């Protein structure tokens, strides 16, 4: 009887599999996970840039690339004088998809936002630094500079490039 119990216990222990260990949310990822993520984003960015370029060629408005990887309707846009940190700005913008369908009925606006202290889309914050009071520009923004891989958890899905019509008030 002891032999049967011993053999049963031994066979049970030998069947145990090592479950993969997943890092906690916000935890540290392995180098392989980081490489996979980096390659995915690089490939997605390449595809989106080509799609945006194709869209631009079908438009009668000229768009110009910026150093941060978005396009604007102003030539030499990011060569202008840059607004400094701590300066304030009031602005509004509307979001569109590339079918030119407005995503939200109401404009998103902020009054007296301070550079370096407000949470905004990377492309919007960067563009605002180069805009003049009363100026309006249109931005073509890849998803990595918009709402990225998670979307806005409302109307904007993950990995969606956007058209942003931005105005300094």
Where do the language-model regions lie?
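Cross-family detector of peptidyl-prolyl cis-trans isomerase
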Residues: 15-169
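Sec-dependent bacterial lipoprotein signal peptides
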Residues: 1-16
